[in-house]
């Protein structure tokens, strides 16, 4: 049975992360009663490693065994408070055990010998750390920073806690995670003067891509700050990095799930697939093979999903492009599906939402892909000008090329996500063509908003509420119960 060992520094004696320590030996009652709790040993005590004779007794768990299984299967954590009191916490999910010990082991010596320069205040390790072992090489500590960042990310994502970074040392950044304990009423209260402190060397994390690849089934790395994010928690965070706020790409299926009320989504034209109309020649990979591999990778037939559903009870027609399918490129199938969606919305007098995420027209289909720009713009003109219906365009990163030049910028209301890359031609193409440098950030959503090309920049979390208010402002209201078919 393999164990993993992690080193944590707790800034308060009471360990409140998912459990609460009671100083009373007589009281033992779960804080949150659940039918599926982790089995714990009531005889286990947390003894003080200092000179005091007091100790903490009994652990009341706030997490079910189901939650822990999603996190970790068999692991041991070393915990130390601000008074250098040290404890060992062991999880064995298979046998449903949760044990806390205070026995010093070689592994504890190994991890406790790891100190940052600011924590030691530039003093000698041998003078300040009784457990310091000079025979242990510093190279062994590289994985500790990586694992600390993994657990650090999980704490924030699954336990309703927030964080910010402070840097008071040249050698490392300290991550102070402020614990928010969820009360029974569902409200979040902040535990006063409590924080979990982990040491994380950001430069080591950026360089250590090999370790990240070994855990890629559990963690995903932010493209901006290179922080590790727990994959299962990423969906609940709407694919937003909790460290730097960077907006990671989100699949079309996940976006539909976030936007449309459960059980109301009705897809359209799912059986429409691309062919090779111009017999495009490629030295690397045939066009049809690329389509087949993209279909296997995404589970989609092409780079857009269209259909109807309800957004907070309001019937809408929705089209969502998926960048994972050949860069969200617009071919004949994408153009036809969007055209049919607009025509259906025109007939049924539905408000229209198109979520753009595309690299532009699909070059493998030549002029057939370019004509989709005119075809979609034509039906949009009838939808907006003749029928006086309401179209919202949502631009995500990246939105470029033919999509930007056509329906992407034709919305009655144009909304962009924060930091979205929106352009007609990419930075590299412009610089190679015009021989001029493109200013940094000039193609970001914030720059376009200042220049009047966008109506608003809305984060993912409040987007559904903003869309609801816009629809109600334009006289689109939720269906009554009697009107729901």
Curated annotation (Swiss-Prot):
Acetyl-CoA carboxylase is a heterohexamer composed of biotin carboxyl carrier protein, biotin carboxylase and 2 subunits each of ACCase subunit alpha and ACCase plastid-coded subunit beta (accD). Component of the acetyl coenzyme A carboxylase (ACC) complex. Biotin carboxylase (BC) catalyzes the carboxylation of biotin on its carrier protein (BCCP) and then the CO(2) group is transferred by the transcarboxylase to acetyl-CoA to form malonyl-CoA. The keyword Cell wall biogenesis/degradation does not apply. Binds 1 zinc ion per subunit. A zinc finger (C4-type) spans 222-244. Its EC number is 2.1.3.15. PROSITE patterns: COA_CT_NTER. It is found in: Plastid, Chloroplast stroma. Its cofactor is Zn(2+). Zn(2+) binds at residues 222, 225, 241, 244. PANTHER family: ACETYL-COENZYME A CARBOXYLASE CARBOXYL TRANSFERASE SUBUNIT BETA, CHLOROPLASTIC. GO terms for biological process: fatty acid biosynthetic process; malonyl-CoA biosynthetic process. GO terms for cellular component: acetyl-CoA carboxylase complex; chloroplast stroma. Its main location: plastid. Pfam families: Carboxyl_trans (PF01039). It catalyses: N(6)-carboxybiotinyl-L-lysyl-[protein] + acetyl-CoA = N(6)-biotinyl-L-lysyl-[protein] + malonyl-CoA. Keywords: ATP-binding, Chloroplast, Fatty acid biosynthesis, Fatty acid metabolism, Lipid biosynthesis, Lipid metabolism, Metal-binding, Nucleotide-binding, Plastid, Transferase, Zinc, Zinc-finger. Pathway: Lipid metabolism; malonyl-CoA biosynthesis; malonyl-CoA from acetyl-CoA: step 1/1. It comes from Aethionema cordifolium. This is Acetyl-coenzyme A carboxylase carboxyl transferase subunit beta, chloroplastic.
């Amino acid at each position: 049975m393999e164990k993993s060992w992690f080193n944590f520094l707790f800034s308060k004696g009471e360990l409140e992360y998912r459990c609460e320590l009671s100083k009373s030996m007589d009281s033992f009652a779960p804080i949150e009663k659940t039918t599926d709790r982790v089995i714990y040993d009531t005889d286990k005590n947390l003894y003080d490693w200092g000179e005091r004779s007091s100790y903490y007794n009994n652990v009341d768990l706030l997490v079910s065994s189901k939650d822990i299984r999603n996190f970790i299967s068999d692991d041991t954590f070393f915990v130390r408070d601000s008074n250098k009191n040290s404890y060992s916490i062991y999880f064995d999910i298979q046998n449903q055990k949760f044990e806390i010990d205070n026995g010093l082991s070689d592994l504890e010596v190994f991890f406790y010998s790891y100190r940052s320069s600011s924590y030691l205040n530039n003093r000698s390790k041998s003078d300040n750390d009784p457990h310091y072992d000079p025979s242990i090489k510093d190279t062994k500590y590289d994985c500790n920073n990586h694992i600390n960042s993994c657990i650090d990310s999980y704490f924030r994502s699954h336990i309703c806690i927030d964080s910010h970074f402070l840097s008071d040392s040249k050698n490392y950044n300290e991550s102070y995670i402020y614990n928010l304990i969820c009360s029974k009423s569902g409200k979040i209260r902040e535990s006063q003067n409590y924080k979990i402190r982990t040491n994380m060397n950001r430069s080591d994390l950026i360089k250590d891509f090999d370790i990240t690849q070994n855990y890629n089934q559990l963690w995903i790395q932010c493209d901006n700050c290179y922080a590790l994010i727990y994959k299962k928690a990423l969906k609940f965070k709407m694919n937003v990095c909790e460290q730097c706020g960077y907006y990671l790409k989100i699949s079309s299926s996940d976006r539909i799930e976030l936007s449309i009320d459960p059980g109301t989504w009705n897809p359209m034209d799912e059986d429409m697939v691309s062919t090779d109309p111009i017999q495009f020649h490629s030295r690397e990979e045939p066009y049809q093979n690329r389509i087949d591999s993209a279909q296997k990778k995404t589970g989609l037939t092409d780079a857009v999903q269209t259909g109807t559903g309800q957004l907070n009870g309001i019937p809408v027609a929705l089209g969502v492009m998926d960048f994972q399918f050949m860069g969200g490129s617009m071919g004949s199938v994408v153009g036809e599906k969007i055209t049919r969606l607009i025509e259906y919305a025109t007939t049924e007098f539905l408000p229209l939402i198109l979520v753009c995420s595309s690299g532009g027209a699909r070059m493998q289909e030549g002029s057939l892909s370019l004509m989709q720009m005119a075809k979609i713009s034509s039906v949009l003109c009838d939808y907006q000008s003749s029928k006086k219906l309401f179209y919202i365009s949502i631009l995500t990163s990246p939105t470029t090329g033919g999509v930007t030049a056509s329906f992407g910028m034709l919305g009655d209301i144009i909304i962009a996500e924060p930091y979205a890359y929106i352009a007609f031609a990419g930075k590299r193409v412009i610089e190679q063509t015009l021989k001029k440098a493109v200013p940094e950030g000039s193609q970001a959503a914030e720059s376009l908003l200042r220049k009047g090309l966008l109506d608003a920049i809305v984060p993912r979390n409040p987007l559904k509420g903003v869309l609801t208010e816009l629809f109600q402002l334009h006289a689109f209201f939720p269906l009554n119960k009697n009107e729901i078919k």
